């Protein structure tokens, strides 16, 4: 598929609800669609799949799927679609479900091998089981695998983990993370989970009342306090870094991120591997001078970009510039005034906790 992603302007009226979505998404990686319940996320995915007859324009990978003069029906759109509760062919076993779409794809067009996908999702012990007997977790693993084995040009995932327990989610997330760097197609992923956003998103789209109102790299959007992503207590940013080395004695790993290095819990990843860390604004304090003799391991020199005073609150959100990224600090207004904090001022960010997302 050409290195072109998704371009869409889709409009749809359903009673009092109106979808008016504008998308321009990268050609590969995971684009996460985030919004409140009822904001139109599922409706947008159904419109992209052709299951809802929306007006407008849709192009995927340089191929026109619809405009004012043409409309490809769902069966002519090269896509995989996995829902919250996916349906399999109940009378067939897991292997037959996997092979059903795979065998219909010409060998030259297959993006992934059958055995490769079986291993990726840990399906070896399920192959002879009837699909109708599968619990929710294994069922979703099989459903995602089936969608991938059709070698689609676009994969739509509508909150595929929302009904699963923690153990089942932990089996699927690493596979999706691996696919992100391996599969050269766009994935459009709906979720309500901040953990999933942190671990999976290469691109973030915010939807509210049927309209897309922000789109871009997660680091930029998550570090903008003006966007209604989280309650201020839960505000956090994600930094992409690289594992530098491990210290088995203290059970710590060093990760290089924009602006310096961070000590994190001992990682399973080898040195040189890319990883992601999450830093909550509530876990960051500020100092004008380099802290000495502190128990806090992670201290970065940063520059204040902006201060945002929270309405009817004693708190202020401070956005801090690193070399090519931002983090947030949520402190009291009293502390901000005492320190004389202002845009452009250089300070030291003391990070009490860093979560390694793996």
From Swiss-Prot:
Specify the Mop domain's residue ranges: 293-358
Q: Does the keyword Transport apply?
A: yes
Q: Where does this protein chiefly localize?
A: membrane
UniProt-listed Pfam families = ABC_tran, TOBE
* A cellular component annotation (GO) from this entry: plasma membrane
Coiled-coil regions, chain positions: none
This protein's record includes keyword Cell membrane: yes
Q: Which reaction does it catalyse?
A: molybdate(out) + ATP + H2O = molybdate(in) + ADP + phosphate + H(+)
Molecular function (GO) terms listed? ABC-type molybdate transporter activity; ATP binding; ATP hydrolysis activity
What InterPro entries does its record include? AAA+_ATPase (IPR003593), ABC_transporter-like_ATP-bd (IPR003439), Mo/tungstate-bd_C_term_dom (IPR008995), ModC_ABC_ATP-bd (IPR011868), Molybdenum_import_ModC (IPR050334), Mop_domain (IPR004606), P-loop_NTPase (IPR027417), Transp-assoc_OB_typ1 (IPR005116)
Report TM segments. Answer: none
EC nos: 7.3.2.5
Q: Where in the cell is it found?
A: Cell inner membrane
Task: Provide the ABC transporter domain boundaries.
Answer: 1-234
The residues that hold ATP are 35-42
Membrane-related topology note:
Peripheral membrane protein
Keywords for the protein's UniProt record, in alphabetical order: ATP-binding, Cell inner membrane, Cell membrane, Membrane, Molybdenum, Nucleotide-binding, Translocase, Transport
The record describes its quaternary structure and partners as: The complex is composed of two ATP-binding proteins (ModC), two transmembrane proteins (ModB) and a solute-binding protein (ModA).
What does the record give as the function of this protein?
Part of the ABC transporter complex ModABC involved in molybdenum import. Responsible for energy coupling to the transport system.
Identify its protein family.
Belongs to the ABC transporter superfamily. Molybdate importer (TC 3.A.1.8) family.
Q: What is this protein called?
A: Molybdenum import ATP-binding protein ModC 2
- What gene codes for this chain? modC2
